[in-house]
Amino acid sequence: EMLRSLVGSEMCIRDSFLDAAREAGYLEIQPPYVVNAASGYGTGQLPDKEGQMYHCNEDDLYLIPTAEVPVTNLYRDVIFNESDLPIKNTAYSACFRREAGSYGKDVRGLNRLHQFDKVEIVQIQHPDHSYEALEEMKAHVQSLVERLELPWHILRLCGGDMSFTSAITFDFEVYSAAQKRWLEVSSVSNFESYQANRLKCRYRGADKKTHLCHTLNGSALALPRIMAALLENNQTPEGIKIPKVLVPYCGFDIID
């Protein structure tokens, strides 16, 4: 019975994240889980993270490490009218990562998995507004963790910790009561024109010339670590308390 409640709770978390994204103006996309190498190069996972991606040798295809890859690649070779921007998409998907070289306590339990589920948000933006969009996306992720009543903080990453494709990245972390440390549940990044240049994702301005768009994405949020944090931080003598925001989705407020 508890296992059934736990599985149901994770689906409720997913649905609440997708509803929040739709309410924030994101159009939901159902992405493919298998992409070609060109897609990986377009968003910058290849060649940088090739060792972390699962490769299907016979077909020369890759399992997606994040929905960012197929969603952003929808706009390869697209020229938008300036008035079309911004484009805001969300997607729920499984994510696949080899996690080569990972070892020790960081790979135990739900910390680091070869397959995990995540809701992603992606924006294609006018360059003049991409940093406003970044703040909007950070506020969106902040609202998710706050509504789940989890202890959290935000970090601005230094250059050495960021993806080479990113101009700026912020990580959101929630506290693991059992492990007594912080776990990353979201990264929000502005890639400026880096991905757009690889993808030839452009818009036509008032000057009738084409210009590169800016791309942004963020996890909103990664489910396994959120689930672990909820289980660890919400234990009571009666059972595991469900955050108020999830009760309408779950139909119960305690897992006992």
Identify what each model region corresponds to.
Residues 1-8:
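Single conserved hydrophobic/aromatic residue that forms the stacking wall/gate
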